[in-house]
Amino acid sequence: MSNVDRAEIAKFEALAHRWWDRESEFKPLHEINPLRVNWIDERASLAGKKVLDVGCGGGILSEAMALRGATVTGIDMGEAPLAVAQLHQLESGVQVEYRQITAEALAEEMPEQFDVVTCLEMLEHVPDPSSVIRACYRMVKPGGQVFFSTINRNPKAYLLAIVGAEYILKMLPRGTHDFKKFIRPSELGAWSRDAGLQVKDIIGLTYNPLTKHYKLNSDVDVNYMIQTLREE
């Protein structure tokens, strides 16, 4: 059975044409992207690395990593977001290879081929996150790193990521997230270790609605990222 939620794909297909509009529903992704790329680059030194971006969508992260000197492949199951990504790279001149394929299928085709794998804001949109994590382990080279980001599952995350972001501040369309699919750091850590990945670091991402700025810090109550390593 394919690890794809067609309803989730449809949500992002409908919004795909606005992916690179910095004032659209994707404004938060554009604003947090530099913070996340810097954090990843500081730990993985992207220049010259072969990188896979799982759940690349319209290519915001993929292009940013390519601009840091990485050779990037972006994969997604959404046809419209991939079309937007391919069109945007014609405008930007940034080279990324985009493919419509699941992580699990690519792991069969390209085991141990990537120095770095990123999987950001994707795990909470698939039926079986642990399956994606196992696929990421299989695709990263021994000694390589895998980065995940998702949203914690607790009352504060429900209040801020759903009620606040979708209903009050209207930063995201209603229904973007399903609270039941949010993932606690303990769960993400356990799935990573079960797959063979060693958790090296965790960082939180917070938003101040007064200043309208994001920052990375130790608060992992809502949005967070983890760095994992496949040992040699």
Curated annotation (Swiss-Prot):
Pathway listed for it is: Cofactor biosynthesis; ubiquinone biosynthesis
Q: Offer one example of a GO biological process linked to this entry.
A: methylation
- Is S-adenosyl-L-methionine a UniProt keyword of this protein? yes
Instruction: Answer whether the UniProt record assigns the keyword Methyltransferase to this protein.
Output: yes
Please list the GO terms describing molecular function: 2-polyprenyl-6-hydroxyphenol methylase activity; 3-demethylubiquinol 3-O-methyltransferase activity; polyprenyldihydroxybenzoate methyltransferase activity
* Catalysed reactions, as listed in the record: a 3-demethylubiquinol + S-adenosyl-L-methionine = a ubiquinol + S-adenosyl-L-homocysteine + H(+); a 3-(all-trans-polyprenyl)benzene-1,2-diol + S-adenosyl-L-methionine = a 2-methoxy-6-(all-trans-polyprenyl)phenol + S-adenosyl-L-homocysteine + H(+)
User: What's its EC?
Assistant: 2.1.1.222, 2.1.1.64
Pfam families reported in the protein's UniProt record? Methyltransf_23
Q: Where does S-adenosyl-L-methionine bind?
A: 36, 55, 76, 120
Q: Which domain of life is it from?
A: Bacteria
**Keywords, sorted A to Z:** Methyltransferase, S-adenosyl-L-methionine, Transferase, Ubiquinone biosynthesis
Family matches, as CDD domains:
AdoMet_MTases
The family classification in the record reads:
Belongs to the methyltransferase superfamily. UbiG/COQ3 family.
| HAMAP family the record matches | UbiG
Protein function? O-methyltransferase that catalyzes the 2 O-methylation steps in the ubiquinone biosynthetic pathway.
List the protein's name. Answer: Ubiquinone biosynthesis O-methyltransferase
